């Protein structure tokens, strides 16, 4: 739509030690941003990774079994009438309907063992043909009759207070919800639907309407991205919001040390980190 300002060549200069983003971004995420294109241009020309994760279900294991939570069909499961929430945005409401409509294929071993599984899966879950959208709309209408709400933020509190027993959630908000519940001695769990889930990325971009021809503004915007990409900034950010940074840290050990501290085994548990 010609609304974004491309990142400068200077932003990608690895010889500049203040370019924390290019020197510290996860190699995997860097590759994803370079290989995926829109209108022939890679994401990396315009976007710098911020956070990333998946979507899944936060659920109350006293009310919902792991098997019941491990499928997108929980959204239409009448056993949980008005006890499950779904996201109130196009992408995260559309995606589950495609998984439900194609669940038999997605769960088949034959399909999963095909040599181009990921390519076929991507095609199915990014299908925007009119007939597919129409089928998705009908499925969403059915889901709407069963769920407690379409929400963006309220699902976290609804889970903690017990208004609902399962909540479609982004992974970082899932961590936040489970941590808050644990503070109240209330145990919640997390499940990834067996059909598939989506891998999402948040990224920083610059709007042409905001930058214009002002080189100082562009330099300031890129400096802001680099500030947030400093390993110490990334750790503080992850700690506060519960999400996973796109920054791996480069030569700095801070990111790994934080991940080990947060998710590593307790003293009386087996450490599985290699």
Model-identified regions with their sequence ranges:
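Hinge/lid segment of periplasmic solute-binding proteins
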Residues: 1-52, 66-73
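Short loop->beta-strand "edge-of-pocket" segments that line small-molecule binding or catalytic clefts
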Residues: 73-91
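Mature extracytoplasmic/periplasmic domains
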Residues: 204-273
């Amino acid at each position: 739509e010609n609304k974004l300002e491309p990142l400068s060549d200077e932003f990608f200069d690895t010889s500049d030690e203040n370019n924390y983003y290019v020197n510290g971004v996860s190699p995997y995420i860097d590759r994803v941003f370079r290989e995926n294109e829109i209108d022939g241009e890679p994401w990396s020309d315009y976007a710098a990774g911020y956070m990333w994760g998946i979507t899944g279900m936060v659920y109350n294991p006293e009310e919902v079994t792991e098997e019941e939570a491990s499928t997108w069909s929980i959204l239409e499961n009448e056993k949980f009438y008005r006890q499950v929430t779904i996201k109130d945005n196009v992408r995260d409401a559309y995606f589950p309907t495609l998984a439900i409509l194609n669940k038999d294929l997605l769960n088949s071993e034959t399909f999963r063992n095909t040599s181009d599984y990921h390519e076929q899966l991507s095609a199915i879950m990014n299908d925007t043909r009119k007939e597919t959208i129409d089928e998705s709309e009908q499925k969403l209408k059915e889901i709407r009759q069963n769920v407690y709400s379409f929400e963006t933020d309220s699902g976290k509190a609804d889970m903690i207070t017990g208004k609902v027993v399962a909540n479609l959630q982004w992974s970082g908000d899932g961590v936040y919800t489970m941590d808050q519940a644990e503070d109240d001695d209330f145990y919640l769990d997390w499940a990834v639907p067996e059909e598939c889930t989506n891998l999402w990325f948040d990224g920083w971009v610059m709007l042409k309407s905001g930058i214009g021809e002002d080189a100082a503004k562009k330099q300031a915007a890129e400096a802001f991205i680099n500030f947030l990409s400093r390993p110490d900034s990334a750790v503080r950010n992850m700690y506060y919001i519960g999400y996973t940074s796109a920054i791996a840290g480069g030569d700095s050990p801070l990111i790994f040390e934080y991940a080990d501290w947060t998710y590593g085994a307790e003293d009386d548990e087996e450490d599985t980190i290699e």
